Amino acid sequence: MTITRRDLMKASIAAGTALAIPSVLRAQSGLAGPRTVRMVMGADLSVFDPIFSTAGITAYHGLAIYDTLFSLDSKFMPQPQMVGKWGVSEDKKTYTFELRDGLSWHDATPVTAADCVASIRRWSQVNSGGKLLMERIRDISKKDDKTFTIELKEPLGLLIDLLASVSTPVLFIMRAKDADRPATEQVTANIGSGPYKFNHDLAKPGASFAYDRNEKYAPRGEASDGYAGGKVVNVDRIIWDNIGDEQTAFAALQAGEVDFVEGPPVDLYPVIESDPNLALQVLDKSGYDMCLRMNFLQKPFDNVKARQAMLHLIDQEALLRVTAPDPKYGRPVTSIFGNTTPYSNDENTGWFKKGGNPEMARQLFKEAGYAGEKVVILQPANIAWIRDAAQLLAATLRKIGVNAELAPSDWGGLVKRRANKGPVESGGWSIFITNDSDYLQGDPTSAIFLNASGEKAWFGWPKNDEYEALRAKWPDVGTLEERKDLARKMQGIWWDFVGDVRLGQFAQPIARSKALTGIIEMPQLVAMWNMQKA
């Protein structure tokens, strides 16, 4: 019998033996009292501008320090957040918004309507829903310091939904002097109006970041409800500790050095469940859809046959055994609209086969003219499920004669490299794996995966004009049944040109100390208000 390092680790943990804790945590353990929460997120924060980047960790940062005009409640209905009052004209073309009282920036200056106008304009440069909004806008303008209007060329019933969407990049409101710069240039000030203030003095890039309670933040009067309602902060400080090794992060949790681990090792779920001081908690009940993004701009995936090869190659069940070995947390997904949305369907899914179809994939690569070009797969070493999925994918590609090469880095390095549109010889890439909330796949106007507008689309830059013409109809379709019909047509085209490849769906619980309660259960983002620590 072969005993692996992981087997030994599980045995030592089950016996109550703490693993070595990073010295930085031992030295700072006095900080983790009841008024301080220490969290290990699933990735290191390397990009701070939540409009510049769609990375989830950057959006979490944005949710802490910025605020939003509208927010989704627990039933996914948009509710006013920074907005105090709003109304729409009889012809449904002019919306008027008035900010609520008590809004101020962390530098003590007041939030104004001009900040909101600039922020909407910047966000709309990069968010799919925002781009749709700008296509319909006649004008967006400040009326006075607290009031602004959006005038439309034609009615857009989804307008408030778009402003409240949690599809990244989220519409976080920034100071006008920050939001006036193009979305392609990073904002570095980290000054928002949200419930937490970024502590610049305690920032240790690559090691830890601290967020302090904004004592001047005035939450709404309503009870907290999803991302909506009053954002009440019950602790003085949140510290994000960057612990790249998942086993070490878990050991720190078990030893009480941290309170929250976003991505605990899947094979340690039973250990966590049996620990009287720890709990697993699923924050996104809809789950996450794993997605393989291919670079449409470079060989071999500029050829549709090569993309179709990937569709046939993938064995979702094998990937799920790696990423979600407990079947209660994982299942296949074949619809671009996910498993849990009203628009999930089986149109054009004949390619799906238990175990995949490697021989068909080999033939399609041959028809694509594949000639041994290097296929570079970006692999984040600090996100276990993506790391392991990339490892399995590379091995599967090599078995059918594809020259697959892994490019390991941390998640921050992957985020930077995936923006490179050049060939692999110039630091580009061929494939990376990521995920998005299944819930978000029900809105193709905002879902980053479902945009196929070429170089204006999300990383991978899929392009198909026929599909995009159908997607453009989505906001104006009146009934649920009509949208379901449109969804089938869109999916039929998508799986022909293969805008991406879905790898399966999983629910990813966080691990926390039982002393930490009140964590908001919503898709996509981790909110840090409402938490309490005993």
Where do the PLM segments sit?
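Surface-exposed binding/hinge segments that line
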Residues: 132-180, 184-204
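Periplasmic-binding protein-like
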Residues: 297, 301-341, 385-389, 493-504
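N-terminal lobe/hinge region of extracytoplasmic solute-binding protein
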Residues: 40-90, 118-121, 191
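Extracytoplasmic/peripheral linker and loop segments enriched in polar/acidic and small residues
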Residues: 352-355, 405-416, 444-514, 534
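Long beta-strand-rich cores associated with HINT superfamily self-processing modules
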Residues: 512-534
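Structural transition elements
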Residues: 196, 327-367, 383-388
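Ligand/substrate-recognition segments at binding pockets and active sites
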Residues: 205-207, 245-246, 264-266, 362-438, ...
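Ligand-site clamp/hinge motif
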Residues: 219-271, 403
